[in-house]
Amino acid sequence: MAVPQSIPPPTAAPIESKDQVFARSKAFWDNYLRGRPQVPPSFFQRIYRYHREHGGRFGTVHDVGAGIGPYAGELRSQFPHVIVSDIVPKNVQLAEAHLGRDGFRYRAAPVEVADDLPPGSVDLAFATNVMHFADQHAAMQAIATQLRPGGTFACAGFGPARFDDPDIQDVWERISQQGGRILLGMAEHPPDTINVMSRSSKEYNVAPLEPQWFRPGALRIRLNMAQGGITGLLPPERQQEVTDPDFAGPRDVVVYETNEEWRFETDWEGFLQHFRSFPHAGADPAAFTGLLQELKDLLDEGRCLRGCWPATLILATRR
């Protein structure tokens, strides 16, 4: 594989506070869409099948914490009404600019706030790559309140690659942990950020499903976890500061699967796109120079950037 002779710096603008983590430019989001997993059709088919088999209606879906709405168009193919929400108003504006108004409604709000949505008005709440940021119990209460009885909560977490080559994966983990150190140094409330980082790693520990709100037998489907799961940001020296419990309940059904549709092979440019899809990449570019060079040296030896996208999908039915 040919690689450039120099390592170009990340193009994302520096982050000044945690509130800006995903308040990013259109250029950042364009790279995000290229650098993150291309979700296979089977992911959505599984959600729709579960929803149908559990008596769900196909009326209104709420894309919670949607960012710029990369999955809202797919949801619109099955639901005539799609609510697109994000905590960052600019993201909602970008979503509206490319999705339009036909069947879409937009709102700027965090996951935990749903006072403007009539109780029981949503058939499916879709929360992908957002639940780790939220106050878990407040978010689940808001989701449960908006869902109609028999409605579906579909929650997923994926994003960071896991590489087959152990040496490449080792460098990638150290790059990710360096990013975690940078974000923790900028955090207004480091204990909260530590829990966010912990939730989003390994098996994606989110979404307590209280029995008064959800039927027993919710599925926690863990894809491609055999080699360690989702590559996390939390530095090893901060692991002991995690205070979250395990949010999987005793009535939940945990399923482990390997899915070849979530595999990838990329090149150096593809890796840089992936790296730049994380907000910390632009915060302190010099902090990553040596690590990126270490990875480039491995590629110069003929190593390959193959791997998988570990992913978790949670499916639960509202009582």
Curated annotation (Swiss-Prot):
<comment type="similarity">
    <text>Belongs to the methyltransferase superfamily.</text>
</comment>
<keyword id="KW-0489">Methyltransferase</keyword>
<protein>
    <recommendedName>
        <fullName>Methyltransferase tpcM</fullName>
        <ecNumber>2.1.1.-</ecNumber>
    </recommendedName>
</protein>
<dbReference type="GO" id="GO:0044550">
    <property type="term" value="P:secondary metabolite biosynthetic process"/>
</dbReference>
<dbReference type="Pfam" id="PF08241">
    <property type="entry name" value="Methyltransf_11"/>
</dbReference>
<feature type="region of interest" description="Methyltransferase domain">
    <location>
        <begin position="63"/>
        <end position="155"/>
    </location>
</feature>
<keyword id="KW-0949">S-adenosyl-L-methionine</keyword>
<dbReference type="GO" id="GO:0008757">
    <property type="term" value="F:S-adenosylmethionine-dependent methyltransferase activity"/>
</dbReference>
<dbReference type="InterPro" id="IPR051052">
    <property type="entry name" value="Diverse_substrate_MTase"/>
</dbReference>
<dbReference type="GO" id="GO:0032259">
    <property type="term" value="P:methylation"/>
</dbReference>
<dbReference type="InterPro" id="IPR013216">
    <property type="entry name" value="Methyltransf_11"/>
</dbReference>
<comment type="function">
    <text>Methyltransferase; part of the gene cluster that mediates the biosynthesis of trypacidin, a mycotoxin with antiprotozoal activity and that plays a role in the infection process. The pathway begins with the synthesis of atrochrysone thioester by the polyketide synthase (PKS) tpcC. The atrochrysone carboxyl ACP thioesterase tpcB then breaks the thioester bond and releases the atrochrysone carboxylic acid from tpcC. The decarboxylase tpcK converts atrochrysone carboxylic acid to atrochrysone which is further reduced into emodin anthrone.</text>
</comment>
<keyword id="KW-0808">Transferase</keyword>
<comment type="pathway">
    <text>Secondary metabolite biosynthesis.</text>
</comment>
<dbReference type="InterPro" id="IPR029063">
    <property type="entry name" value="SAM-dependent_MTases_sf"/>
</dbReference>
